[in-house]
Amino acid sequence: MPGRLLRGLWQRWRRYKYRFVPWIALNLSHNPRTLRYVPEESKDKVISDEDVLGTLLKVFQALFLNDFNKQSEILSMLPESVKSKYQDLLAVEHQGVKLLENRHQQQSTFKPEEILYKTLGFSVAQATSSLISAGKGVFVTKGLVPKGAVVSMYPGTVYQKYEPIFFQSIGNPFIFRCLDGVLIDGNDKGISKVVYRSCNGRDRLGPLKMSDSTWLTSEIHNPLAVGQYVNNCSNDRAANVCYQEFDVPAVFPIELKQYLPNIAYSYDKQSPLRCVVLVALRDINQGEELFSNYYTIVS
C-alpha cells in the first residue's frame, strides 16, 4: 500500500512540476530544447489572427451545418440574412436536394472528428500518451496537419490576473498562463468543472449558448477542444506545435459561439474573450503525438 501511494504521488508530481515555479527556475537551463524564445510579446504569433479566425469560423460553420436539425430555435432568433446564408450553404453542400423541406428525413451521420477531417484534412483525439507516466496525450488520428495549421484549442475558464483562482489551482496541472498574466483553467474535473459549468449557464441567452461545455464530457462537440492534454516536449521529442493567444473579436457570429470552449470567469462586456490555439510548427503525420513548449521565454 505505501508503495502504491508513493507511485501515485510521484506520477502526480511528474505532471505538476511543470507548473511549479521553483522547479522551473532550477531546471530551465538543463532542458534548453524544451524552451521557446521570442524577442517580444508582439512577435509571439506564428500565424496571423485573421488566419486563426478563418480556421475557427470554417470548422464551427461546418459543425453548425452538420447539426442543422437541432439549430431551429437558434435560427429563429437570427436575422433573415443570416438564415438565408446558412440555407444557401446547406443547399450547396447537398446539391439538388431541397433540404429545407427534407432535412428532417436525413439523419446527420458525421461525428465531430469526421467534420474536422472533411473541413481541414485531419483529425485529432485524446489517447494514452507515448510518454511513460504522462497520462493522456493528443494524437493526429487521420490525415496530415500542414505547417501553420490550427490543430487544437486550449479549453477552460478564463481568469483575469486580478480574479480569484487559488482554490481551483491547488494541485491543478491544467492552469495555462498567457503572456499578459491572463489564466485559463483547462481542468475538466473537480471545482474547475463546477466553475466552468456555472459560468456557461450564467451567460446563456435562451437557446443561444455563449460557450461549449461538452469538452467536460466524453461527447465533445468541438473536436479541436483537446489542447489541455498536449504534453510538454523533451530533449528527445521536439515540439511540433506551439501555443498562440487569440482574442475573439466582437463581430464573431453569435450562433457559432456555442463551439467556443472558453468562458470568462466574470461577465465583462468590455474585455474580449481570450482563447489559446495550438499551431503546427511543421507538417505532422497521422499517428504522431502532439508536443508543445510549456515555457516561452520573452527576451
UniProtKB/Swiss-Prot annotation:
CDD domains per UniProt: SET_SETD9
EC number annotated for this UniProt entry: 2.1.1.-
Alphabetical keyword list: Methyltransferase, S-adenosyl-L-methionine, Transferase
InterPro entries, alphabetized: SET_dom, SET_dom_sf, SETD9
One GO MF term attached to the UniProt entry: lysine N-methyltransferase activity
Enzyme class (EC, first level): transferase
Residues holding S-adenosyl-L-methionine: Y294
GO cellular component: mitochondrion; nucleoplasm
Entry-linked PROSITE patterns: SET
UniProt name for this protein: SET domain-containing protein 9
Source organism of the structure: Homo sapiens (Human)
